[in-house]
Curated annotation (Swiss-Prot):
InterPro entries reported in the protein's UniProt record: AH/BAR_dom_sf, Amphiphysin, Amphiphysin-2_SH3, Amphiphysin_2, BAR_dom, SH3-like_dom_sf, SH3_domain
Subunit and partners: Heterodimer with AMPH. Binds SH3GLB1. Interacts (via SH3 domain) with DNM1. Interacts with SYNJ1. Interacts (via SH3 domain) with DNM2. Isoform IIA interacts with CLTC. Isoform IIB does not interact with CLTC. Isoform IIC1 does not interact with CLTC. Isoform IIC2 does not interact with CLTC. Interacts with AP2A2. Interacts with AP2B1. Interacts with MYC (via N-terminal transactivation domain); the interaction requires the integrity of the conserved MYC box regions 1 and 2. Interacts with BIN2. Interacts with SNX4. Interacts (via BAR domain) with BACE1. Binds (via BAR domain) F-actin.
Modified positions (Phosphoserine) in chain numbering: 296, 298, 303, 331
Regions annotated as coiled coil: 15-42, 193-267
Region (Interaction with BIN2): 2-122
Any single GO BP term: regulation of neuron differentiation
Domain SH3: 520-593
Location of N-acetylalanine modifications: 2
Pfam families xrefs: BAR, SH3_9
Official protein name in the record: Myc box-dependent-interacting protein 1
Pathological association: Myopathy, centronuclear, 2: A congenital muscle disorder characterized by progressive muscular weakness and wasting involving mainly limb girdle, trunk, and neck muscles. It may also affect distal muscles. Weakness may be present during childhood or adolescence or may not become evident until the third decade of life. Ptosis is a frequent clinical feature. BIN1 mutations have been found in families segregating autosomal dominant centronuclear myopathy. Patients show adult-onset, mildly progressive muscle weakness affecting selected proximal muscles and all distal muscles of the lower limbs.
Role: Is a key player in the control of plasma membrane curvature, membrane shaping and membrane remodeling. Required in muscle cells for the formation of T-tubules, tubular invaginations of the plasma membrane that function in depolarization-contraction coupling. Is a negative regulator of endocytosis. Is also involved in the regulation of intracellular vesicles sorting, modulation of BACE1 trafficking and the control of amyloid-beta production. In neuronal circuits, endocytosis regulation may influence the internalization of PHF-tau aggregates.
Length: 593
C-alpha cells in the first residue's frame, strides 16, 4: 500500500510539473506574439547584466591565475634542474661546495613556499569568491520562471473577470430553456449550481494569483538586495587579490636576490682561487662577412654596370688594369644617401667642374674628357705637394666631332700609348709635387687651379701652333716653356670648348640649339626606376622618362640628392615651366647626353 501511495505522489508531481511547463510555454508564446503583456523591472535587469559581467571577469581572472601558478611551478622545476646541474659539475675539492648545495636547497624551498602561498592567499580566495555565483545564478533563473507563473495567473484571473458578463448570459440562456423542460422546483437549484461553479473558478484563479505573486516578490526582494552588494564587493576583492600577489612576489624576489648574491660570492671565491684557468670567449670573424674595405655599393637590379674608366695620373693606364680597392670615386656625391624609398639608391657619379674641354685624340676615335679638380678631391698615389696643380682625366667615349679644328701637327694617324715618349720639362717649370720626366710620366702643364676662371671660350676653338690654348688666365714664362715642350711631343689635339654653366645659367655659346629647351637648362637625365611622388612638388617618374634638369630658383632650397627639372614630354606638350617642373631624386636617374 505504501508503494502504491508513493507511486501516486510521484505521478502527481510529474503531472503538476508538466502542467506548469505547458502553462509557462503558452504564456511565453502569447507574450512574444504580443497578445499578453509582460512584467518588466529595468532596475533588476541592470543588476542581472552587472552580475553576468562580474561572473565573466571573475572566471577569466581565475583562469589566468591558474595559468600563472602553472608557470611558477614550471619555473620551479627548471630552477631545480639547473641547481642540480650546478651541484653535479661542482667538484668536491672546489671551495664553497657546501655553500652552493645549501643555496640550492634554499632556492628549492623558496620556490615551494612561494607557490603554496599563492595557492592559499590568491587561488583559494578566488575559488571562494566565485563559489557564490552559481547559487545566485540559479535563483535568478528561478525568479524568471516565477515571473512567468505570476504573469500567467494574472492573465487568467483578468480573463475570468472580463468574461463574467458573458458567463452570466450563458447561464441565463439555458435557464430559459430549462423553464420549458424542467419542473418549476428544479430551475432554481440548477441556476444556483452554475453560479457557484463560476464563483469557484474565479476564487481559485485569485488564490493562484496571490500565491504566485507572493513567491515572486519574495525572490525578487532577496535578489535585489544581494545583487548590488555583490557588484560592489568586487572592488575590495580585486584589491586584496592583487595586493597579495604583488606582496608575495616582492618578498620572493627579495629572498631570491639574496640567494643569488650568496651564490655569486661563492663563484667569485672559486674564480679567485682558479684565476689562472679563466676561460675567455673571443669573438670569431664570420667567414661569410666581407671585409669592410672591400665592400662597395652595388647599383639596383636592372641598372647598367658602371663603364670602365681610365685613371690618369700623368700616365696612361689600360682600362682593365685598375687594381681592386684603388678606384677613385668621381666625386663625393657617391657617398650621398638617397631618399629612403625602394628601390635601393643608385650611386650616380656627378662632378662639379670649372671648365670642360674635350681633346680629340687618335683622330676622332677616342676622345678623353679632361676635368680640373681641386687637390682635396684627388687622391692620387705618390708624393704630391699641396700647392701642386693636379689633373683628373676621365676618358669617356663620346660621339665624333663633326668639324674639329686641328693643330698644325701630323694628322690622320692614331698614336698608340706605347709610342708616347716622356718629355723633359725645364727646371722649375713644374711644381715640386709633380712627377719629373725621369719617372716616365706624361707631363702636361696646365694653368694654376687657384686662378679664377676667365670668361668662357667661344664654340670655335682657335688654332695654336705650339699647342692648345689655355682655358683661363695667363701663363707664367716657365709654364709657357713647359707647354711648348709638351706640345712638341703630343699628337694631333682637337680642342672644343663648350659653354660654361654657373649655377645652372649658360654663359656664352650659341643658343640656336636650345630654343626648345626650358630656361636655364643644364643637362638631361633618364629615369632608371619608377618613382612615386610623395608630395605636390615632386615629379612622378616611370622608368625611361627623360627629365630636363634646371637650376633651383633659390639654391638654399635644394636638398642633397635632389634635382629640379621638368619631364621632356610635359615640356614639349605644354611649354609651361611653372606647372610642369618639380623635384626628383638624383639616384633614381642616370645622366644622358
Amino acid at each position: 500500500m505504501a508503494e502504491m501511495g508513493s507511486k501516486g505522489v510521484t505521478a502527481g508531481k510529474i503531472a503538476s510539473n508538466v502542467q506548469k511547463k505547458l502553462t509557462r510555454a503558452q504564456e511565453k508564446v502569447l507574450q512574444k506574439l504580443g497578445k499578453a503583456d509582460e512584467t518588466k523591472d529595468e532596475q533588476f535587469e541592470q543588476c542581472v547584466q552587472n552580475f553576468n559581467k562580474q561572473l565573466t571577469e571573475g572566471t577569466r581572472l581565475q583562469k589566468d591565475l591558474r595559468t600563472y601558478l602553472a608557470s611558477v611551478k614550471a619555473m620551479h622545476e627548471a630552477s631545480k634542474k639547473l641547481n642540480e646541474c650546478l651541484q653535479e659539475v661542482y667538484e668536491p675539492d672546489w671551495p664553497g661546495r657546501d655553500e652552493a648545495n645549501k643555496i640550492a636547497e634554499n632556492n628549492d624551498l623558496l620556490w615551494m613556499d612561494y607557490h603554496q602561498k599563492l595557492v592559499d592567499q590568491a587561488l583559494l580566495t578566488m575559488d571562494t569568491y566565485l563559489g557564490q555565483f552559481p547559487d545566485i545564478k540559479s535563483r535568478i533563473a528561478k525568479r524568471g520562471r516565477k515571473l512567468v507563473d505570476y504573469d500567467s495567473a494574472r492573465h487568467h484571473y483578468e480573463s475570468l473577470q472580463t468574461a463574467k458578463k458573458k458567463d452570466e448570459a450563458k447561464i441565463a440562456k439555458p435557464v430559459s430553456l430549462l423553464e420549458k423542460a424542467a419542473p418549476q422546483w428544479c430551475q432554481g437549484k440548477l441556476q444556483a449550481h452554475l453560479v457557484a461553479q463560476t464563483n469557484l473558478l474565479r476564487n481559485q484563479a485569485e488564490e493562484e494569483l496571490i500565491k504566485a505573486q507572493k513567491v515572486f516578490e519574495e525572490m525578487n526582494v532577496d535578489l535585489q538586495e544581494e545583487l548590488p552588494s555583490l557588484w560592489n564587493s568586487r572592488v575590495g576583492f580585486y584589491v586584496n587579490t592583487f595586493q597579495s600577489i604583488a606582496g608575495l612576489e616582492e618578498n620572493f624576489h627579495k629572498e631570491m636576490s639574496k640567494l643569488n648574491q650568496n651564490l655569486n660570492d661563492v663563484l667569485v671565491g672559486l674564480e679567485k682561487q682558479h684565476g689562472s684557468n679563466t676561460f675567455t670567449v673571443k669573438a670569431q670573424p664570420s667567414d661569410n662577412a666581407p671585409a669592410k674595405g672591400n665592400k662597395s655599393p652595388s647599383p639596383p637590379d636592372g641598372s647598367p654596370a658602371a663603364t670602365p674608366e681610365i685613371r690618369v695620373n700623368h700616365e696612361p693606364e689600360p682600362a682593365g688594369g685598375a687594381t681592386p680597392g684603388a678606384t677613385l670615386p668621381k666625386s663625393p656625391s657617391q657617398l650621398r644617401k638617397g631618399p629612403p624609398v625602394p628601390p635601393p639608391p643608385k650611386h650616380t657619379p656627378s662632378k662639379e667642374v670649372k671648365q670642360e674641354q674635350i681633346l680629340s685624340l687618335f683622330e676622332d676615335t677616342f676622345v678623353p674628357e679632361i676635368s680640373v679638380t681641386t687637390p682635396s678631391q684627388f687622391e692620387a698615389p705618390g708624393p704630391f705637394s699641396e700647392q701642386a696643380s693636379l689633373l683628373d682625366l676621365d676618358f669617356d667615349p663620346l660621339p665624333p666631332v663633326t668639324s674639329p679644328v686641328k693643330a698644325p701637327t701630323p694628322s690622320g694617324q692614331s698614336i698608340p700609348w706605347d709610342l708616347w715618349e716622356p718629355t723633359e720639362s725645364p727646371a722649375g717649370s713644374l711644381p715640386s709635387g709633380e712627377p719629373s720626366a725621369a719617372e716616365g710620366t706624361f707631363a702636361v702643364s696646365w694653368p694654376s687651379q687657384t686662378a679664377e676662371p676667365g670668361p668662357a671660350q667661344p664654340a670655335e676653338a682657335s688654332e695654336v701652333a705650339g699647342g692648345t690654348q689655355p682655358a683661363a688666365g695667363a701663363q707664367e714664362p716657365g709654364e709657357t716653356a713647359a707647354s711648348e715642350a709638351a706640345s712638341s711631343s703630343l699628337p694631333a689635339v682637337v680642342v672644343e670648348t663648350f659653354p660654361a654653366t654657373v649655377n645652372g645659367t649658360v654663359e656664352g655659346g650659341s643658343g640656336a640649339g636650345r630654343l626648345d629647351l626650358p630656361p636655364g637648362f643644364m643637362f638631361k637625365v633618364q629615369a632608371q626606376h619608377d618613382y612615386t611622388a610623395t608630395d605636390t612638388d615632386e615629379l612622378q617618374l616611370k622608368a625611361g622618362d627623360v627629365v630636363l634638369v634646371i637650376p633651383f630658383q633659390n639654391p638654399e632650397e635644394q636638398d642633397e640628392g635632389w634635382l629640379m627639372g621638368v619631364k621632356e614630354s610635359d615640356w614639349n606638350q605644354h611649354k609651361e615651366l611653372e606647372k610642369c617642373r618639380g623635384v626628383f631624386p638624383e639616384n633614381f636617374t642616370e645622366r644622358v647626353p
